[in-house]
């Protein structure tokens, strides 16, 4: 993947526009989870250190496009950055006609979704973004799968368009896991529905030595083996697809599970064989035997790609399967890459972030990359690198 990298450029005295992913949860004007901003700090600091005139922007939430709304302002992000960088950070609301920035100064440009035409990748808007800078830095992997004015169009018209350190690291880590992985390569795909992850499962079945399925997805495979799954979440219409995958790939289907008669945090967890599930029961987690079998597989892996929990880990009684799998990944010597919102929540819950080789900041972009789809923002950077 040939793109210009920010780290290869001389930024001194240049106007730099960084498109970051600062779409963080905010409550009462305060940032409640700072993971995405923390991930962007090294990029900001590197540009400031070189004496660049630094502008950074992002979307936040889903405001009505073209209208300012205090609820979706980047002001809480500015407050956070001021505290972390121990220096003043300016928030610019009106910036499309130009912004004055001093060398070594950081200015945050207000939520891009307040600008009409952002989501449609409007050319006039993209040109206005491009005219603000000498160098455009795309560093938001989480939005690289969307062709929008601040992620795609601007890169077409900016004097120079490059990949920031975070985006470069994401692409390298995913490339390492997918293009020529150290083997055995094990992929874990959890989540509620096969339908939303069918392309991912299909792609990974051709790359992985073993494909682990969890959550509602695993229930469809349990049903495909002819077992009663009771009131479990599963997709009857996708049983033929599941059967095909069972033939083409090594998928360790659960042999024991934790079930309940209701979907609730206080429901009693009943451990049983997949042969014995009753009509009024639903599978909410893996059983001990199945979880341990997965842990043994992960112990011998050399590459692990993890997307999605293997049970309803939000309920303490049905957390064990995901915890056993998560700790096995943490203890493994494999190169491990994890992505997706629920996966990151599980990593936080079990406190294993420092034991995962690479944690991806992208949800949809992570899945689309794994599916083998081209990410529009990355394609544009590749095109600009050829010019």
Curated annotation (Swiss-Prot):
InterPro entries named in the record: Phosphoglycerate_kinase (IPR001576), Phosphoglycerate_kinase_N (IPR015824), Phosphoglycerate_kinase_sf (IPR036043)
Keyword Phosphoprotein: no
Top-level taxon of origin: Bacteria
Keywords of this entry: ATP-binding, Cytoplasm, Glycolysis, Kinase, Nucleotide-binding, Transferase
Enzyme Commission code(s) on record: 2.7.2.3
Sample GO molecular function, one term: ATP binding
Main enzyme class: transferase
Entry keyword annotation includes Cytoplasm: yes
GO biological process: gluconeogenesis; glycolytic process
Residues annotated as binding ATP: 197, 314, 340-343
Localization per Swiss-Prot or TrEMBL: Cytoplasm
Catalytic reaction list: (2R)-3-phosphoglycerate + ATP = (2R)-3-phospho-glyceroyl phosphate + ADP
Metabolic or biological pathway, per its Swiss-Prot or TrEMBL entry: Carbohydrate degradation; glycolysis; pyruvate from D-glyceraldehyde 3-phosphate: step 2/5
Pfam families, alphabetized: PGK
Binding residue positions for substrate: 21-23, 36, 59-62, 113, 146
Gene3D superfamilies given in the database record: Phosphoglycerate kinase, N-terminal domain
One of the record's GO cellular component terms: cytosol
PANTHER family in UniProt: PHOSPHOGLYCERATE KINASE, PHOSPHOGLYCERATE KINASE 1, CHLOROPLASTIC-RELATED
Oligomeric and partner information: Monomer.
UniProt family annotation: Belongs to the phosphoglycerate kinase family.
Name of the protein this chain belongs to: Phosphoglycerate kinase
């Amino acid at each position: 993947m040939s793109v210009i990298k920010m780290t290869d450029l001389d930024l001194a005295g240049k106007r730099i526009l960084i498109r970051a992913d600062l779409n963080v949860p905010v409550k009462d004007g305060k940032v409640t989870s700072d993971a995405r901003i923390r991930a962007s700090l090294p990029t900001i600091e590197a540009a400031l250190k070189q004496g660049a005139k630094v502008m950074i922007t992002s979307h936040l939430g889903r405001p009505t496009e073209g209208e300012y709304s205090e609820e979706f302002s980047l002001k809480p992000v500015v407050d956070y950055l001021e505290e972390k960088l121990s220096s003043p950070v300016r928030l610019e609301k009106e910036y499309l006609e130009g912004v004055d920035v001093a060398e070594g100064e950081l200015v945050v440009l207000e939520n891009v979704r307040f600008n009409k035409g952002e989501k449609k990748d409007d050319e006039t808007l993209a040109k206005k973004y491009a005219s603000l800078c000498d160098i455009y830095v795309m560093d938001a992997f989480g939005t690289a799968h969307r062709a929008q004015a601040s992620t795609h169009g601007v890169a077409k018209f900016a004097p120079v368009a490059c990949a920031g350190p975070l985006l470069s690291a994401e692409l390298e880590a995913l490339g390492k896991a997918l293009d020529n992985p150290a083997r055995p390569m094990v992929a874990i795909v959890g989540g509620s529905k096969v339908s939303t992850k069918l392309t991912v499962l299909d792609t990974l079945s051709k790359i992985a030595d073993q494909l682990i399925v969890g959550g509602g997805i695993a229930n469809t495979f349990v049903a495909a083996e002819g077992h009663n799954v009771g009131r479990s979440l599963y997709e009857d219409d996708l049983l033929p697809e599941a059967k095909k995958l069972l033939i083409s790939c090594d998928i360790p289907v659960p042999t024991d599970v934790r079930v309940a008669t209701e979907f609730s945090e206080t429901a009693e967890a009943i451990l049983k064989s997949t042969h014995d599930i009753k009509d009024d029961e639903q599978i909410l987690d893996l059983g001990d035997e199945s979880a341990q079998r997965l842990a043994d597989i992960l112990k011998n892996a050399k590459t692990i790609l993890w997307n999605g929990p293997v049970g309803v880990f939000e309920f303490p009684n049905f957390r064990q399967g995901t915890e056993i799998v998560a700790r096995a990944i943490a203890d493994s010597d494999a190169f491990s890459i994890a992505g997706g919102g629920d996966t990151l929540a599980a990593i936080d819950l079990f406190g294993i972030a420092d034991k995962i080789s690479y944690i991806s900041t992208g949800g949809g972009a992570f899945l689309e990359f794994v599916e083998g789809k081209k990410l529009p923002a990355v394609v544009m950077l590749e095109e600009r690198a050829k010019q």
